[in-house]
Amino acid sequence: MAGYPTNGSVYVSNLPLGTDENMLADYFGTIGLLKRDKRTGTPKVWLYRDKETDEPKGDATVTYEDPHAALAAVEWFNNKDFHGNTIGVFMAESKNKNAGDAVEFVEFDGGAEETNGGAGRGRGQADSSAKPWQQDGDWMCPNTSCTNVNFAFRGVCNRCGTARPAGASGGSMGAGRGRGRGGGADGGAPGKQPSGAPTGLFGPNDWACPMCGNVNWAKRLKCNICNTNKPGQNEGGVRGGRGGGYKELDEQELEETKRRRREAEEDDGEMYDEFGNLKKKYRVKTNQADTRPAVAAGRAGWEVEELGIDKDGRERSRDRQRDRGRDHHYDKDRRRSRSRERERGKERDYDYDHDRDRDRDYGRERGSRYRN
């Protein structure tokens, strides 16, 4: 049953008095993500209780999201101390293979004989989940998302690179039930773990994932369940980039950047931002200053700009007033010339009429003289 589990449920026996669902969820949740009830949202942990007294009977079932996590729980938690009692942890078996989720959790009378392969009657047969090419000493990767079976000579998993745990052995994976082919290294020692098994599951430097609560080994920089970064670790340092991205800058580099910025400002007299770009307002004022003569020192740039604007405005107003004065004098002179021309015309008409009358009188006098 250890190679490819069909479900993610494990059966736990010999629990001490006072055990509740939260204690089991905290303990078994350290190796994998527990499945949650869709209605209540709580981890799927079931304590068997007496029908009459409603007291816990000392056994329970725990369901994982990943069946391989359940397999790892059997490997790590079986025959371990839990609040003073040595508990038994076994894979759950379906009562009916076609019944879907209907699972019967079987209590084993002989401790771990049924799982580890005790001396049975008959020829026996190798576990159906065991690989035919497996040999004594082969070991399974402890990474619950990998569970690759590696040859005995490998020190790390050839699929995910996880280090081989101390005392890991795959002998139980080839164990048969009874005598016969497939009898593994643990076949004659029912209820016992390999001699080199680690005494504890996690060390003091192992860390719990802040997202899913999974406990990871100290060497991991990411959670092996949800890929969340280890607390205190990030991929690129401080987000100091212009777009909020990662940008690693040490103190020496910052000082060098400031020094170069000061040198650039002293060379061309312009202001730069922290990224080395010319500031916009100083860029505009520099262009305006190029088109105007220099102003007396000691005034700020904006004061120079405002004075220049006021000066130009006053000059324009003077020009407009001067133009208006010229137009006024021109109109006045034109009106005067017109009045003079009219007066001269009147004088000419008067002189012409006077001369004509005088000639007429002279003609009359001559005519009367000749008649007499």
From Swiss-Prot:
Gene3D superfamilies: 3.30.70.330, Zinc finger, RanBP2-type (4.10.1060.10)
Subcellular location per the Swiss-Prot or TrEMBL entry: Nucleus
Basic and acidic residues bias spans: 245-264, 308-372
Compositionally biased spans, kind Gly residues: 168-190, 234-244
Molecular function terms from GO: RNA binding; zinc ion binding
Pfam families: RRM_1 (PF00076), Zn_ribbon_RanBP (PF00641)
Record-annotated RRM domain positions: 8-94
Coiled coil stretches, renumbered: 245-272
UniProt cross-references to SUPFAM superfamilies, sorted A to Z: Ran binding protein zinc finger-like, RNA-binding domain, RBD
Main subcellular localisation: nucleus
Top-rank taxon, per record: Eukaryota
Keyword field: Activator, Coiled coil, Metal-binding, Nucleus, Repeat, RNA-binding, Transcription, Transcription regulation, Zinc, Zinc-finger
Any GO CC annotation of this UniProt entry: nucleus
Tissue and organ expression note: Expressed in roots, leaves and inflorescences.
InterPro entries per UniProt: Nucleotide-bd_a/b_plait_sf, RBD_domain_sf, RRM_dom, Znf_RanBP2, Znf_RanBP2_sf
SS bond partners: none
Annotated region (Disordered), positions in chain: 111-136, 166-199, 229-272, 285-372
ZnF segments: RanBP2-type: 135-166, 203-232
Chain's role: TAFs are components of the transcription factor IID (TFIID) complex that is essential for mediating regulation of RNA polymerase transcription.
Family: Belongs to the TAF15 family.
Quaternary organization: Component of the TFIID complex. TFIID is composed of TATA binding protein (TBP) and a number of TBP-associated factors (TAFs) whose MWs range from 14-217 kDa. Interacts with TAF4, TAF4B and TAF12B.
Protein name: Transcription initiation factor TFIID subunit 15
Gene designation per UniProt: TAF15
